C-alpha cells in the first residue's frame, strides 16, 4: 500500500459534507490514504466518524489514519496515527501501539525527519511544503529544496503536505516525494471524486516520467 494520494478530511471547507461523506467520495476517486482530522470534535463524535471511515477505507482498500488522537485511532481500528510537532512524540507512541500500527510524523527540517525515523516513524510528511490556507498555524512553506534534502537524508516514505495543487504536484514528485497529502485540492472541490481521480492521474504520470 502506497502513499501516492493522501487525502485529509476537513468539514470546514467540505461544502456541507461530513468527514464520512468526504472520505467516501475521496476513496471512490482512488485515494490511497484517508486521514481523519478535526481538532474541534469531542472524542466521542470523532470516534463515531472514525468507525464509519474505517469501514469505508476497508471496502476501498485504502489506509486509514487518524490525526493526533492515538486513542481514537486504536479504538476505531485505524491503520495508524499522524503526529504533528506538538503532538505525542513518535517514540512514546511507538512504545504503546500494537504491532504493525503505522505512525506518521509531520516534519519541517532534515533534523526532524532523521529524528522521527530514529524514533520509529513509518513515514514523514514535510509540512508545509508550500504556503497553505488550510491550516492557520502552518507557517511559511519549506519549499522543494527542503523536500530534496529530506529525501536524501531518510529512506522512509516521504509525503509532501501544504499548498499542493494540480499545478505543482509534478514538481513535488520530481523533487522526491513518494506522495502528496491534500486538503483543499480535493475535499474543497465541488466534485471530490473527480478531483481525487485527476490528482492521482497526475501523480502517476509524474512518477512514470521520472522512471
Swiss-Prot record:
Disulfide bridge map: none
Residue numbers binding 2-[(2R,5Z)-2-carboxy-4-methylthiazol-5(2H)-ylidene]ethyl phosphate: 132-134, 163, 183-184
The keyword Transferase belongs to this UniProt entry's keyword annotation: yes
GO CC terms: cytoplasm
Secreted is among the record's keywords: no
Biological function: Condenses 4-methyl-5-(beta-hydroxyethyl)thiazole monophosphate (THZ-P) and 2-methyl-4-amino-5-hydroxymethyl pyrimidine pyrophosphate (HMP-PP) to form thiamine monophosphate (TMP).
Protein name (database record): Thiamine-phosphate synthase
Gene from which the chain derives: thiE
